[in-house]
Amino acid sequence: LIYVDVKCGSVKVKPHSSAGALAEVGGQAIKNIEMLITRNKNLKAANWNILASSWPTRNAPQQMTERIRLLRGARFSAPNQETRERAVEQAWEIVAQRRRSSRVQKEVWIVSANSFSATHFEIQLNKGHNGSQESLQAYQLIQSWISTANSNDVDLKIFVSV
């Protein structure tokens, strides 16, 4: 069971390794670990009331009709709103069932595209205390997230720009 939080930056040049850029997406993902581990069958996502609507929004230039892409191992496309709403209920029941199971591996994926550079981060960390303070703060933030994830038996994966 994987919780994915994605934020795409808009820098025109290669991104650096700012703690702020990473915190924007990662903080949200870590805050939502509860969605992966709770035994509360009735706990719904904060965006529950919009899961049956198009994504990202009705006014977006590129829009996907379905937020649910796969259901029970098959590609999903609803012929009408009633079917779409029923699919959201079915999908959420699967999530609720799996998150209660200790046999199901849980992961949080933090995707910080075009806003955080792994190369810049590594260069700054190799400078030790002379590295960028923002990068050193990002390191501390990542360590905190790893600790939180580990204490909840959740794997953490972070995807960033090169």
PLM feature spans:
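Long, compositionally biased intrinsically disordered regions
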Residues: N59-E66, L70-R72, F76-E89, Q97-V162
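Catalytic cores of nucleic-acid endonucleases
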Residues: G9-P56, V108-V111
